[in-house]
Amino acid sequence: MIFHYYFYTDWDVQELLKNAIALSDKNFSELNNFYFSRYPNNIFLTVFFSKIFTLFNGLLGQDFAYVFLLVIQSILNILSGVLILKVTLLLTKSEKYAFFSYWLYLLILWISPWVVIPYSDSMGLIFPILMYYIYTHPKMHYILKSVLLSAIGIIGYSVKPQIAIMIIAIIMVSLLTQKIEMKPLTATIIAIFVVSFPMFFAINRINSTAGFDLDYEWEMTYHHFIKMGLNSETDGGYLANDVGSSISIENKEERVIYNKQIIAQRIKDYGVTGLINHQAKKTLNNYNDGTFGWGLEGSFFEKIFPNDSYVAKITRSFYYSSGKLHLIFQGIVQSIWLSILFLVLGNVLIGREKMTREFLVLMTSLIGIFLFESIFESRSRYLYTFVPIYIVAATVGFQQMTQNFKKRALKLKTGVKNEQK
């Protein structure tokens, strides 16, 4: 279906693709060193894209390579749905609830057009749910789990930094809830180090030898994104003036000092009440969009390819902002997303006896992504990679709501019978 409505977009995606093609063609003079000096976290994905372009350069051309990237993302999307099903079955021990979670996946992720945007959101979709699946796997040896989680966590972080929230949640819960035994702990640490160091070295090597001439004085540090997250003009969203003010300071140390001063000033100007109100608006921005910011980035529909087929007309009407059916698409995903968020609340009903490590990791990861969005720049798109985790949490919450309702109904029925006697 993606072949009928895919298009070229602008913003960061275009920057990655242009530079991936330049790397593939070894046209190093065309590389945007300034962009990647500012955002070095995008280098790994750009290098990966370049390898795909290199693979198809002499065969079917760049257009086919682009479509192949979308096929990869489609496969990752489908695999994410399978993992949602498996994890939910393990947690709820119910096929009924497992299939319920899969229906949620179909209605918000499988249907999602983000699969045609080759970027870290769709490429990173599988990582949190894959790590959680490995962690919850009942028969996998703990050393193998540690090795796989380390490897996948490092790759995931290189694709999209907030993916690391899942591995942080796993580490935190493990340290706080598990009894520490020196022998298995030592074996685990050794296994992690044996995997992690070579992988870190390999990824750094890939990034540093790709062909970019980076000036790390231009790097946008986390202080910039905290500053932007505190702006009142866009309620913590992207603000061109904030980007411009950071770029205007060439010295990295001076830029960090400047951003810290702006952070302190904005917090002072808000005050306690103002900061709470700002956070409320920011949370609404983050969580009140079931499309996850579809169509809002840059010149989104930059180049649309002619296609007069019936399927193309329907899908484009459904997914393109100007389409007659676009409001239906928005209505479907918005209602499903708000339902997911509501069902997540059912987890507060879970008793202590059901608070397993798996459950605690699930909740901790959601708290982690909430804090990430609360502290840094606000975008609903940044939630996309964690939607599979939200679906799992929503299904577990729905099961708990149902069980509590049945218990109360039974008590009420029993009480009425006793009164009649």
Regions found by a protein language model. Give the residues of each.
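Loop-to-helix entry region of an early transmembrane alpha helix in multi-pass inner-membrane enzymes
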Residues: 39, 43, 58-79, 327-335
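Transmembrane-helix motifs of polytopic, lipid-linked glycan transferases
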Residues: 71-92, 130, 342-346
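Membrane-interface alpha helices of multi-pass inner-membrane proteins
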Residues: 145-160, 171, 195
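Transmembrane-helix signature of polytopic, membrane-embedded enzymes
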Residues: 84-107, 357-360
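Short acidic/glycine- and proline-prone juxtamembrane loop motifs at membrane-interface regions
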Residues: 113-123
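Membrane-proximal stem/loop segments at transmembrane-domain junctions that anchor or position
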Residues: 208-309
